[in-house]
């Protein structure tokens, strides 16, 4: 009937984030692709990019699904960083196959979360520490944390229906979506 690509969150893995929902989706007739994002679970890698590089990985998985299961509609489902990742995938030029996105507790940008956590933990050293982390990301990973913006990505493509689940202030820093 349909294929759902399930994308877990930061420092998690597919079996932790989807142990409850995967059996339900399968029972409802969905074929599932449960992946471990880079630097998580059984996947390799040494740098998490908060959805920036992971988006490209999911696009490759989407291409694989389109080759191996032609004609079946595809849905993307992500939790936390996985939600941000699938929302950025939805912002890419449409393949015509993505029929919908489920985003559970995604963020509009990781920058306020990271800055807020560092400031709360390190006080006045929070801002310089963030700058050092971002510099490390640019040098080692070829990306800046400011590139991760699911909110901006969605402005590129608004034709795909999205279902958002989110609490009120868990992520902090004002980075929850304004749905």
What do these predicted ranges mean?
Residues 157-158, 163-166:
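Short beta-strand/loop motif that positions the catalytic acidic residue
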Residues 88-146, 155:
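Hydrolase active-site cap/lid region
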Residues 48-69:
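Alpha/beta-hydrolase active-site loop
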Residues 171-178:
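Conserved alpha/beta-hydrolase "acid-adjacent" motif
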Residues 24-44:
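Conserved alpha/beta-hydrolase
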Residues 2-9:
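Short beta-strand element of the alpha/beta-hydrolase
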Residues 10-24, 37:
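The serine-hydrolase catalytic nucleophile loop
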Residues 69-80:
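Alpha/beta-hydrolase fold nucleophile elbow
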């Amino acid at each position: 009937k349909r294929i759902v690509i399930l994308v877990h969150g930061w420092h998690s893995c597919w079996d932790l984030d989807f142990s409850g929902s995967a059996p339900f989706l399968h029972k409802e007739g969905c074929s599932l692709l449960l992946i471990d994002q880079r630097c998580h679970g059984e996947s390799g890698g040494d740098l998490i990019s908060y959805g920036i590089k992971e988006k490209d990985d999911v696009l490759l998985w989407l291409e694989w699904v389109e080759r191996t299961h032609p004609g079946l509609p595809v849905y993307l489902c992500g939790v936390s960083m996985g939600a941000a990742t699938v929302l950025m995938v939805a912002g890419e030029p449409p393949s015509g196959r993505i029929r919908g996105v489920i985003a559970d507790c995604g963020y509009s940008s990781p920058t306020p979360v990271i800055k807020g956590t560092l400031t709360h933990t390190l006080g006045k050293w929070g801002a310089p520490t963030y700058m050092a982390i971002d510099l490390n990301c640019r040098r080692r990973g070829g990306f800046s944390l400011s590139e991760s913006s699911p909110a901006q990505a969605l402005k590129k493509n608004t034709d795909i229906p999205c279902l958002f689940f989110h609490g009120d202030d868990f992520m902090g820093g004002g980075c929850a979506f304004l749905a």
